[in-house]
Structure formats: C-alpha cells, structure tokens
Amino acid sequence: MCALFAEVSSTAAASCSFGVLLCSGSNCGRLVGSERRKVLYVFNVNVCKKMSSYYFLRHDNIVIPYLLRLLVSDKEASNKNPLLPFLMDKERSHHFVRNMN
C-alpha cells in the first residue's frame, strides 16, 4: 500500500488541511508513469474551493496529481494522521515534496 497526501497553499490553509488517498500497486487502475495505481479508499473528503497551489508527496518517484483534487477538511481526523508532523516539517520532507503550482 502507499499513501498520497496533498497540502493547500497558505492562502487556503485556514479552510483546508490534508487529503489522504490509499492506493494499491497490484490492483491496477489508471496508468501513471511506469506503475498503475488504483484508489481503494478515500476518507473525510471535502472539496476546498479556495485552493491555489498543491504540494504532492512523491511515492517511488511518481507524482500523481490527478488524485489530489480532493482534500480532507476534518482537522480532527487529520491531526490523528501519524505522518502529518513529518509532512509539516519542510526540512525533512523537502526532498520528496514537489510544488505543482
């Protein structure tokens, strides 16, 4: 399994937090790069209309931007995400986070 995360720009940070999509490399869905990923679970989904830029977590050097239109707005659920502190720490996450603006 792999996890995919999105972060909104500072202008929208007040209304949006993080989106999480779980995907599987074995159950093929849409072809992205050299691998296929299929979304198996999406939770706490809400569409943030004030988004102006995205930051994407790279998994196996593959960026999957089309999945990240949906963001989590439930901050309580987001705060329980064990990877959230890591993603918020730009020093540690910079090498595999890409600005897709």
Swiss-Prot record:
Knockout-associated phenotype: Deletion confers sensitivity to citric acid.
Origin: domain of life: Eukaryota
Designated name of the protein: Uncharacterized protein YKL102C
Organism of this sequence: Saccharomyces cerevisiae (strain ATCC 204508 / S288c) (Baker's yeast)
